[in-house]
Amino acid sequence: MSIDINWDTITGGTEGSARAEKIRAFIHDRFQQITLPRFIRSVHVHSFDFGSVPPEIEIKDICDPLPDFYEDDEDYPDEEGDEAENEAEDATPGAGDKLRDSSNPSNRPSRDSQSRERGRGAEGPVGRSIDHNQLRPSQPPARPSTKRSSLAPNELGSPFFPGALTPGIPGGTSNMNYFHLPLSAGLSGAATPLAAVAGAQLHSWLDNPHRPSTPTNMRLRHAASVNSLTLTPQSHPDPTSRPSSRHQHDEGKRQSFAGSDDGASPHGYTRTPSASPHRMHEKSPEDIQVVTHVQYSGNIKMSLTAEILLDYPMPSFVGIPLKLNITGLTFDGVAILAYIKKRAHFCFLSPDDADALVGSDIGFNGLQTDAQGQNPRPVQRPKIGGLLEHIKVESEIGGQGSGKQVLKNVGKVESFVLEQVRRIFEDEFVYPSFWTFLV
């Protein structure tokens, strides 16, 4: 199934200009947080334009939302709280201004204690929630490895393991079976955890020791075992800390159960309850998630200025502006859009997850022959989900009309800026990071 997008309606008019300005301001703010190399003094983003070429979107699957999308944000309650806020806004003048001000990170209370744990032993920076057309990223910083060989007995039938079988109920209890579309036939189930969420049986990829790791496995394991007891050394009595590997996790459970019989741990540990789990939204039959293949090769534009420092005749003697104009890019990725109550969650998948999900039917791209038209050989299409595959950039140095370019760091500056653009996109939009629209 394909979708026709009225690109002019989305990007044109005053609303389109406002969206472009928000994106420009967001990218500019992110560049101000980046540690610049010594030869660059500053980077400024001046303009952003969507261009006239729309992306190509193809629906690949319709299924249940990912478990992470059900996690509650304590600063922004669910629809019952939203209705109460709307009533209060109608009754109290100026209440809407206070609610809008809450989207400004400088006006919001600290959320260090409310940061989402992604099962990686570190807290990522919290995002911002924005009213209606504004967005909120949920961004963990890193993606460590974790392995899991089998399900614990208490995890069978857990709502956080949609593919796990519930005793006595064939096929499990998920309200929508992920094997219902043909695209899942090409999934081996041993590629990534997201393949299990989007089409493979859970126990298959859990039993495969060679499965690549993503944070979804640890995320689901933590959600399913939040009621178990963990052991914390007396020298570190932080109840919020928890084991970061399966070995430590299982060892803690074994010692916890042994301590219940002996009254004390033989290693001098004290038994403390694990951190309370995040409150999860209740699942509804109306919840839906759409998996799409997004391709774009257009004339999107962005203008940046990087100030290059000259070290002659002395270090950092003078700065010369280098203007970079991004005039287009090529994009290929798999996007997820989930609608749960009054929230729409959006993200892209990493190349490994995307290839495991929808890459099985697009690997062959015809035959190619040599110059004499002989020796045909198959041509493999590039792996799906490569995200930002190519960025077109033009550079201008100093004032116009000089006609000379004598700086040696121009290539380094271009490479640095483009790499940061890629990194900003991957950090903000690639799962397990996602954005939330309040609709």
From Swiss-Prot:
Protein's membrane topology: Peripheral membrane protein
GO molecular function: lipid binding
Regions annotated as coiled coil: none
The entry's keywords: Endoplasmic reticulum, Lipid transport, Lipid-binding, Membrane, Mitochondrion, Mitochondrion outer membrane, Transport
Biased composition range(s): Basic and acidic residues: 109-121
Source species, domain of life: Eukaryota
Main location, first listed in the record: mitochondrion
Subcellular location: Mitochondrion outer membrane; Endoplasmic reticulum membrane
UniProt keyword Mitochondrion, yes or no: yes
GO CC annotation terms, alphabetical: endoplasmic reticulum membrane; ERMES complex
Segments of skewed composition (Polar residues): 229-243
A single GO BP: protein insertion into mitochondrial outer membrane
InterPro entries: Mdm12 (IPR027532), SMP_LBD (IPR031468)
Region of interest: Disordered: 65-165, 229-284
Main function: Component of the ERMES/MDM complex, which serves as a molecular tether to connect the endoplasmic reticulum (ER) and mitochondria. Components of this complex are involved in the control of mitochondrial shape and protein biogenesis, and function in nonvesicular lipid trafficking between the ER and mitochondria. mdm12 is required for the interaction of the ER-resident membrane protein MMM1 and the outer mitochondrial membrane-resident beta-barrel protein MDM10.
SUBUNIT field: Component of the ER-mitochondria encounter structure (ERMES) or MDM complex, composed of MMM1, MDM10, mdm12 and MDM34. A MMM1 homodimer associates with one molecule of mdm12 on each side in a pairwise head-to-tail manner, and the SMP-LTD domains of MMM1 and mdm12 generate a continuous hydrophobic tunnel for phospholipid trafficking.
Family according to the record: Belongs to the MDM12 family.
PANTHER family, per the entry: MITOCHONDRIAL DISTRIBUTION AND MORPHOLOGY PROTEIN 12
Domain comment quoted from the record: The SMP-LTD domain is a barrel-like domain that can bind various types of glycerophospholipids in its interior and mediate their transfer between two adjacent bilayers.
Protein name: Mitochondrial distribution and morphology protein 12
Species this protein is from: Pyrenophora tritici-repentis (strain Pt-1C-BFP) (Wheat tan spot fungus)
Organism phylogeny: Eukaryota, Fungi, Dikarya, Ascomycota, Pezizomycotina
